[in-house]
Every structure is written in C-alpha cells, then in structure tokens.
C-alpha cells in the first residue's frame, strides 16, 4: 500500500470489556466493515492496548492502509475520535462479583435451573494470558474448603486449572483410578494462598500438550481438578474432552481465561467474573 495512517489513543482496556457481543465494542469494531468499502482503503485495524504491559508506549491504536491518502487518514481519525468519545462506556461483558458471591449464586442457580447448562465462573484475576501467574491457589482453596461443594454427592465441578509439577511427577507413577497426592500451585504467586497439598483419585492423564506439557485430572469427591506441569488456559471444549471431561454437562465450570470464546460462551447457563491476583482496574 502507498499510505499508512496510525493514531494512538491513550486508553487501556482489558479484553473482558471490549467484547463485540455488547456495546460499545460492537459498534466500534462494526465501523471497520462499513469503512473498509471506501475507495482506496485496503485494511483497518483497531488495537485496545495490552492492559497488562506496564510500558509508557502501551496504549490503544487505530491503523489504516491503502492507496487513497485522504480516505486512509480520514478513516483513521474518524475511528480514533469515536473510540475516544466512548472510552468511559465500556463495561464487563458479564456480571462481576466476589468469589464467595459467585459460589452462592452458583448453588442457587443449580437449585433453580431448568436445563443442564453449567454455571461458569471465570477467575479472570489468575488468567495466565492476561497478567496473572495462573498458579494462584486462593480460588481452589476456597472451593475445596466449601462444605456445600466438596462432598461426595456435591455438584459436579471442573476446575481448570492449576500448575503442580510435584503432583504431576507423582501422578505419572500412579495407575488410573488410584489415589495420588502432591503439592499444586503458588510456585510464582503465593501472596494470597500457599501451595495446596492435593489428594484425590487420578482420573485421566494426557501428555505432550504444547502449553501444559503434562495434564492430569484429580477427582476430589465431585470436584475435578485439572493439574498441569506448566500453566495453560482452557479455552475450548476439546481441551476438556481429551481429559475425559464434559464441560457441557458439568454443574459448575471454573476457568481462568477472562472472556469466553464462543463455544464456551454458548454452553453457559450463567456466567460471572471474579478476580483475585491481577486486577482489571486500570485507571
């Protein structure tokens, strides 16, 4: 292309606030499709900035390229000005609350629901793809200590996930169906909760994942804890199915990925965000 235009915007927004499912993100990104049809415009891009990168250069930007100088510059300025005008209108794509309230609402939902769709809690404060260490044990510790959740006939729960090289080492020397014990979590971030000595039944083992390296499922009563050798976000249904877990039919699904990709979003019965380690307060 002959021309490129770039406009910086002094804004930082987490992904949980810039979803195209809701306004104003829907209208902001919707401008691209409308304006790309202008003569001499090849491509338009909008970046919301990486809210977890503590660098002076970090900010939102609009970039356009094409062969028509006037249109390329005009479009860049138009979108950048619109972005700035709606900067205070961005909200979380789902309700946010404390973990304690999330658990209370999950239990209420399970008692009242009219379908088998899971209650999803996204622990965005420990999201390894957005500023979190991915190994904070605070949430898992609360769940394991909750008598309404951690019991033989309790709700079926999938917790994804917690790194635990110590437990992984022990699990790889254990047969499926046998009991295994080992420490998990708090290797990088123990500010909120120490490592947990996890004890349960080895349900499944998966080796060779490019992110996790090794994955195992440890069942504690009805709580299925995914333990990894290295931290890994669980975005897709296939991530669970290869571990013999069915997120569509579980009662409560806890993930650490912030906003949900469409296939997880579509199976939710209810969705809440909670936060502990890495806060989404960027102002």
Predicted regions and their residues:
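A charged, well-structured terminal subsegment
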Residues: 2-6
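Acidic side chains
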Residues: 123-126, 135, 251, 259, ...
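Short gly/pro/ser/thr-enriched loop/turn and capping motifs at secondary-structure boundaries
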Residues: 1, 166, 261-262
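Conserved protein kinase catalytic core
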Residues: 129, 262, 282
């Amino acid at each position: 292309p002959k021309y490129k235009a770039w406009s910086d915007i002094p804004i930082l927004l987490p992904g949980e606030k810039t979803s195209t499912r809701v306004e104003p993100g829907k209208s902001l990104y919707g401008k691209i499709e409308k304006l790309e049809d202008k003569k001499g415009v090849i491509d338009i891009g909008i970046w919301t900035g990486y809210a977890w990168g503590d660098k002076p250069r970090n900010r939102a930007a609009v970039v356009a390229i094409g062969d028509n100088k006037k249109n390329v510059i005009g479009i860049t300025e138009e979108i950048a000005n619109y972005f700035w005008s709606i900067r205070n209108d961005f909200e979380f794509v789902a309700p946010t609350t404390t973990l304690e309230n999330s658990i209370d609402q999950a239990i209420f939902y399970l008692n009242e629901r009219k379908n088998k769709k899971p209650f999803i809690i996204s622990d965005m404060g420990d999201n390894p793809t957005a500023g979190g260490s991915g190994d904070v044990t605070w949430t898992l510790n609360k769940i394991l200590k909750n008598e309404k959740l951690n019991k033989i006939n309790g709700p079926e729960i999938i917790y994804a996930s917690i790194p635990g090289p110590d437990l992984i080492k022990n699990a790889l020397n254990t047969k499926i169906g046998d009991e295994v014990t080992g420490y998990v979590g708090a290797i990088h971030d123990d500010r909120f909760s120490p490592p947990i000595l996890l004890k349960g039944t080895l349900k499944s083992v998966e080796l060779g994942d490019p992110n996790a390296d090794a994955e195992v499922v440890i069942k504690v009563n009805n709580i299925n804890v995914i333990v990894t050798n290295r931290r890994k976000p669980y975005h897709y249904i296939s991530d669970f199915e290869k571990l013999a877990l069915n997120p569509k039919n579980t009662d409560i699904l806890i993930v650490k990925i912030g906003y949900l990709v469409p296939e997880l979003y579509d199976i939710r019965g209810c969705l809440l965000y909670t936060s502990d380690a890495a806060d989404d307060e960027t102002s």
